[in-house]
Amino acid sequence: MIALCGSWCHNTRAMTPSLTKYAKENGIDTIYTYDFNLDDNENGNTFIRMSDGSENAGVNYNYMYGEVVKQYLTNIDDWIEFPSTTERAISYTNAKGETETVGRIQQPIAFIYNKDNTTNYSDKEDNADKYPVMYAFEQMVERDKDGLYTKEYDEEGNEVTDKNGDPVKHYCTKKYNAQMKKMFDFINDNNIEFTEYSKEDFVRENYPALKDAEKVNIKTVTYRQFAWLLQQDGNAIYMVGGPYDEATQNEIADVNAKAVKNDVNVYLWDPYVDGKISEDDWGYKNTGDIMKSDSINFMYTTLIENSLTNLTTEEFENGADGASLTYKNDAGEEKTVPVIKSPFVFSFNKDATDEDGISAPITAYSEKADTLDAVFSAYADGITK
């Protein structure tokens, strides 16, 4: 089971308790989630489910949404409110420069997926060879202390309010839960069995050097998880890189071995918002690297401003070409920061200071395999302090 949703979204927060309840009642302990909002920010600026012509930063990556729908969710039109034939469908430009149109999936949506399913379980007539989306539940509601509800809107899309100026609410808890329960009844009636995949499975498959490792202490994290971890107390070790990068592939076994030996997890963050799949597999020219993309490099500089305040690299110190990024902060000041070259491994403690008492959260870093020991030593020193 997969849910397209985000913790920033009030509709997601409304759905989650009900979805979790029915999943537990039916013995489903894992629901895989994905968010089309690149930085999970509530302002929606990096939301990629946008049609060409939109003004937010995410529209530059709307092909990521389009390709996922076109290549994998091929029958999603049968299950959503705004399929590709409606005015609210999503248009994007493919790798060949052609305009494509796909259905507009609302967040949140929960669905049962099997890429090899050949049975059409929807009530729509279709002659496809496969129907990977076996069942989907897409209903937009909100939640308060009294339950689930929808708001009332006028013909122009404005909220209808009562005499006190509060939005008019129509509570629908029982109806909503009954509709969601149908998905779980479908699971039981059709004896659907779920296959579980873990982050470790992903790491082993995408990093061949770790395929047969006795233990894997490399834990992949999303952008939001990375930003959150950097704000937590205590010591940690992080690695920046991705499976597309040969240098990361060459070093990751050594990093994992040292992590296992030191009984510590290393959190691996990929600076590509698409894992470089758009370039390597789909033929797009636009880069998904947040350090190189003008439209979303603020995601990278935000990490530096908020957490990685003493970040530096050898190439940055030597003034090498391409080793820095210049931008203007919220105050309009021009800043220049280092660009990380994968793989980059560092030990971190948000409260660490240097010998002069100045904040220095990155306590050690490594850009080469032969300097990894310094990172693990700094981590160990931080633990014993």
What are the residue ranges of the model-derived segments?
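Local sequence-structure signature of Cys/Sec-based thiol-disulfide redox active-site neighborhoods
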Residues: M1-D39, A227-G275
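Non-catalytic, surface beta->alpha helical segment in thiol-disulfide oxidoreductase systems
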Residues: E100-F194, K335-K385
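Long compositionally biased, domain-poor regions of proteins
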Residues: N318-A331, P338
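Short catalytic/ligand-binding loop motif for oxyanion handling, primarily in non-cytosolic enzymes
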Residues: N11, N41-E42, T118-S122, E246-A247, ...
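Extracytoplasmic/secreted proteins, especially bacterial periplasmic and envelope-associated proteins
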Residues: H10-K21, Y63-Q71, N75, K175-K182, ...
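Short, P/G- and charge-enriched loop/turn segments at secondary-structure junctions
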Residues: A95-T99, K328-K335
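Thiol-based oxidoreductase modules, predominantly thioredoxin-like and allied folds used
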Residues: I28-I90, D263-E314, N318-G319, L325
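N-terminal "domain-start" segment that seeds a small globular fold
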Residues: A178-K181, D185-Q225
